[in-house]
Amino acid sequence: MALALSGTACSMGGSESPASPTRPALAGGTLHLALAAKYVTLQDPTILDPAAPYEPFDRIDAEILRCCLVRTLLSYTGLATEDGGTELRPDLASAMPALSQDRLTWTFRLKEGLHYAPPLEETEITAADVVRGIERTAGIERTATVSGSGGTVSGSGGSGGSYSTYYSVIRGYDSFARGETDSIPGLEVVNDHTLAVHLTEVTNDLGYRLALPGSAPIPADPRDPSAPYGVADGHDEGYGPYLIASGPYMIQGADLLEPSMAASAQPRSRGLTKRSLTLVRNPSWDRSTDELRGAYVERIEFRVMKQAEAERGLDQGTIDTIFSGSSTKQVERYLADPELAPRVTRGTVDFSVGYTAMNLAVPPFDDVHVRRAVNLAYEANRWIRVTNRHTSTASGVGPLGHVAPDATEEDLLRHERVYPFNPAAAKAEMARSSYDENRDGICDDPSCKDVFALETNLGFEKYADRVWVDGLRKIGITLNIRRIANTDKYTEMSLDPTTKIAMNLGAFWTADYPNASNLFATLFTSNGIGGQFYGNESLVGVGPDDLHRWGYGVTSVPNVDAEIDQCLSFIGFAQTRCWAELDQLLMTRIVPWVPQCTLEYSGVRSERLVRFPIDQALDVWPALDQIAIAPGSD
């Protein structure tokens, strides 16, 4: 599949807006959701705080904020990648931003007449509120009092967590975050409905960054309009229970909040407790001003319970879906029953990639023919079957045949499989290498024996690694696999180039947002060596001085810095196509990885749910603003 670059590097791209969601006759009712107590907690003080550290795979509330409680300048529809769900669209903004010729200034025009939820229903959302939200995100990060995860589900790769990762490119952001200034000069309020964002460097994925929860607007404090963080002032340990919504829903009881009182004396929204969360319709929200969200149901109720209790409720119809996911046993039971099978929704987590990294500075992997041979010798379908057999969650894993998660490339390479399992072709590639002297397809060099392979140790690996051992033995490579149960230790070893790990079997990456810029600029440049969570294990782009300093005998490795810089110079869909082309180049000419898998999603829904889309723009969750209930079933 060859992709030709198209489009202009000076256009923001994105979609102006989809067709407005048509409110069907089946709209209304209460959506009943379960949260498995084993995986999720509502006791974290940072729950529903837009400024809390952002980890797309960790935070269940990222979806709740997007779908229901806050609006941002740009956002997403809550649909699957294939349905355009990962395309940026205007939300608070009336259109996609205008960019200056040097692309260092992005100007957003906000929609007029948008108001906050009660008790501030008379307060219009303005550009100053967006500035206030970003400044609070920077300030909270400085004080480090908001440090939770918004309800932890699992760990992740990616570069998420610190918002400075995303917003440091805004002029003056870092100085403000360090407490050196009292404002961010790069955030210019031109007027109530116009915001100009001034950057220190060209950042063509800024739109995705401003769609994150940390840029959500915060209204001014009616008691003290000069309060730097508005109604969130004084709530450094967690703003969620006091949040004034801008989306189609609000927390039950939020209309009784008293933002004019001192923060310490303010009552919490009664709809957020340690065991439950209830969202109700925001009467200030107007469907005609929101082209992204269907917001069909009137009320959404979450309850924390044991997994077994949640699954019984789903079977009995008292629970509509388990937001944190059903067990493998429940999914398999439904799939085995022809009447129940249609109630299972399956799909891929288009945000993640699991891969094996080959170190291009360690023989025999300094030879591209060996790296191609390894890809061809890897029996992907068998590895996936074994892994899923020994994984307890219903999500499981599915195949991925290229580098970047599909959501970051708008599905351009979804069906790409550069190296299907082919033992004969693997031997042919090995025979072309400098490590097969007699050209019989089997490596006969000592470097192919006892190859150091690092692996995680979550439980399934001792079974799945047999696929690697069997496949590589046939081309003359034997592995010395070291499994590390401690995640911190595994990460420390992965990030240290002096460990000379030849193959890293447990590498994993989760995108921060549906754009591949972070992945390529981290995992395939020297900037990704050390200090990054799951960085550049393959050492692509490392210079000769570093290779010598780290004790490698190899003096050069492939470099794609120029290709990455070219892609970074594009914007919108032109950049997306460029990433897809670079993905293909890496897989065919550089071959630093064996792409192994993406995570899969399996969701069971009640019979009365007649719409059950999956949001793939912020990882993968049921899209609560797009779910609908059959009329008369409440």
List each language-model region with its residue ranges.
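Extracytoplasmic/peripheral linker and loop segments enriched in polar/acidic and small residues
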Residues: 24, 372, 384-387, 414-423, ...
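Tryptophan-rich aromatic "cage" segments
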Residues: 49-52, 243-246, 255, 535-546, ...
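Gly/Pro-rich hinge or "lid" segments in bacterial periplasmic/extracellular proteins
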Residues: 77-83, 156, 181-183, 192-193, ...
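Structural transition elements
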Residues: 391-435, 456-463, 570-573
